[in-house]
A protein has these predicted regions:
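Flavin (primarily FAD) cofactor-binding/catalytic cores of flavoenzymes
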Residues: 1-111, 123-156
Length: 156
């Protein structure tokens, strides 16, 4: 995508004899269609009042901490441009620090403000679709997590 060899297209409206026609009216002649749907984020074991990923959006501080429910954490709920396992490891280290009270969280209002800031950044960077709601750039996200781990230690 970054090199321009792959073009991002909107949803398919229909396929005629040789072309795929997209919802924006553009057309592409195709030989093969690869149907990759991604996934829908859902937590059927939680009440919707706890977490409701409408449009695949999750309101989690650094995609890890639920600001309204102390002790509710998520690991690996991100779509990195890079590897997920090191991110999950760093999230786990942070969560362990929080559980062991070696680190603290910022005020709820600050966490919610950061969640909204991240959401706006995603909307500005990508098309407004459920596809990119948990997208992260590996290195900046890892730095942000480490920065939060370090800040959290000063809050206890």
């Amino acid at each position: 995508v970054g090199h321009g060899k792959v073009k991002i297209k909107p949803d398919i409206d229909y396929k005629d004899v040789r072309d795929v026609v997209f919802v924006d009216g553009s057309r592409v002649a195709v030989d093969t269609i690869i149907y990759a749907t991604g996934y829908k984020i859902s937590f059927p074991f939680f009440d919707d009042t706890v977490i409701n990923p409408e449009n695949n959006e999750v309101s989690l501080y650094h995609l890890t901490v639920h600001p309204d429910y102390k002790g509710l954490y998520f690991v690996g709920l991100c779509q990195p441009l890079g590897a997920v396992m090191p991110i999950a490891e760093r999230q786990s280290i942070w969560i362990a620090d929080l559980i062991e009270e070696k680190a603290g969280l910022p005020p709820e209002s600050e966490m919610k403000q950061e969640i909204q800031k991240r959401r706006e950044s995603i909307y500005n960077r990508y098309d407004n679709s459920p596809r990119h709601t948990i997208q992260v750039d590996f290195f900046p996200f890892m730095k942000d997590l480490q920065r939060e781990i370090d800040r959290g230690k000063s809050r206890v």
